Amino acid sequence: MKSSLRLNTGIILQIIGPVMDISFPSGKMPNIYNSLLIEGKTESGDRLKVVCEVQQLLGDNVVRAIAMSATDGLQRGIKVIDTGAPLSVPVGVTTLGRIFNVLGESVDKMGLIDYSITLPIHRAAPSFVELDTQLSIFETGIKVVDLLAPYRRGGKIGLFGGAGVGKTVLIMELINNIAKAHGGVSVFGGVGERTREGNDLYQEMKESGVINDRNFKESKVALIYGQMNEPPGARMRVGLTALTMAEYFRDVNKQDVLLFIDNIFRFVQAGSEVSALLGRMPSAVGYQPTLATEMGGLQERITSTKVGSITSIQAVYVPADDLTDPAPATTFAHLDATTVLSRNLASKGIYPAVDPLDSTSTMLQPWIVGEEHYNTAQSVKKTLQRYKELQDIIAILGLDELSEEDRLVVSRARKVERFLSQPFFVAEVFTGSPGKYVTLAETIEGFKAILSGDLDEVPEQAFYLVGNIEEVISKAIELQ
């Protein structure tokens, strides 16, 4: 095996940043997406190991490849080995609780990884006959999400929110709940975000029990990071590495998987960085002409099959808050739901700070969720919308100037707003309140009771940071 690999070696002709041209012997050209390996020593004696991926065949036995790590120390004339296959990464239980880079190498220095089962990162999306065509809700146990912007099993959700409004805590709670309620696992792909954030997430996951560093197999998540200091090749492919690990849990272990991508915009950005170096003509706003194809290739692999599902939650950065920018606009075409986090709610102490009026879902249709769920959700939105409209009047004239009917709407809306808050399992260490998983049936029952007027006499403090409606009543008795 090794002798045949040794025969298929090429040499570097030119290096332009992360992109290099490599010449191979006639008749021994590597395929597109093949992984190429450069090993040796720099002039200063440092060990050199760079993995590249073939992107183009230029003719005259020359290929153009993108490096997955820094190209410092490389020179023209250095030997390059064709591995004969695409980049492959470890999959399965061995990945749980560990941190990987784009190449599937562990970076947490926490012991060896079992490389006996690996899969290539470039794979075809499931065929039509394998897909699950049933529209079903993915219950998260989080009231505001399940009622007003429900997630689709095997769907894609966009997560919008600035810094410090609770994105990380919401992500950790979802990871915790899918493990407990669905027996599923999660895969977190950190694409082009800050190293500090990745480290904070890892430490918080250890504190909250999502990662068990004494027995990794009991962990609920695998982490794959390609941070913003990495070359664009790594940031462009780290999403595929995370997706490949998630696909194994879905297809082989037959599990429900949550795939987090933070941030999907950085995946597009990395592609645009290398696009010009690959000689492609830029399209709108300087993005790569293959933007829709690259996005589609990633998103189409995220789906439900007859044996399991991958539900993906993707943080979406919107450059300059311009929703018509080609990167977010292309992402929106693939999303089934959006969860928008509001700084205004976070400042009131209402967590999770999910904006009930801005968050949307294509699943909120009466023929999918049922008439009762649909009508309750619409009534909640209507009440909150009316409260929002009345806030200017309240600020200027006060509550006393409102009609009896509007005062009742405001009272119920404030109770609804507080009842949309919920104590999280992963936040127990900060809040001191035990976490609550609220089923969809309990959620609908609770909001119907508030809107029907059954709880008009209950003080609004009783609705804050509780689970189901029974807890509201018992808390009200304690407050008396």
From Swiss-Prot:
Its EC number(s): 7.1.2.2
Pfam families, per the entry: ATP-synt_ab, ATP-synt_ab_N, ATP-synt_VA_C
Family annotation (InterPro entries): AAA+_ATPase, ATP-synt_VA_C, ATP_synth_F1_bsu, ATPase_a/bsu_AS, ATPase_alpha/beta_chains, ATPase_F1/V1/A1_a/bsu_N, ATPase_F1/V1/A1_a/bsu_N_sf, ATPase_F1/V1/A1_a/bsu_nucl-bd
Name of the protein this chain belongs to: ATP synthase subunit beta, chloroplastic
Coiled-coil zones: none
NCBIfam families per the UniProt record, alphabetical: atpD
Source organism: Euglena gracilis
Subunit organization: F-type ATPases have 2 components, CF(1) - the catalytic core - and CF(0) - the membrane proton channel. CF(1) has five subunits: alpha(3), beta(3), gamma(1), delta(1), epsilon(1). CF(0) has four main subunits: a(1), b(1), b'(1) and c(9-12).
GO CC annotation, single: chloroplast thylakoid membrane
Topology term for the membrane: Peripheral membrane protein
Reaction equation(s) it catalyzes: ATP + H2O + 4 H(+)(in) = ADP + phosphate + 5 H(+)(out)
A single GO molecular function term of this UniProt record: ATP binding
Superkingdom as given in the UniProt entry: Eukaryota
Described function: Produces ATP from ADP in the presence of a proton gradient across the membrane. The catalytic sites are hosted primarily by the beta subunits.
Cellular compartment(s): Plastid, Chloroplast thylakoid membrane
Keywords for the protein's UniProt record, in alphabetical order: ATP synthesis, ATP-binding, CF(1), Chloroplast, Hydrogen ion transport, Ion transport, Membrane, Nucleotide-binding, Plastid, Thylakoid, Translocase, Transport
Gene3D superfamilies listed in its UniProt record: 2.40.10.170, Bovine Mitochondrial F1-atpase, Atp Synthase Beta Chain, Chain D, domain 3, P-loop containing nucleotide triphosphate hydrolases
EC class name: translocase
Example GO biological process: proton motive force-driven mitochondrial ATP synthesis
Binding-site residues, ATP: 161-168
SUPFAM superfamilies (alphabetical): C-terminal domain of alpha and beta subunits of F1 ATP synthase, N-terminal domain of alpha and beta subunits of F1 ATP synthase, P-loop containing nucleoside triphosphate hydrolases
Primary residence: plastid
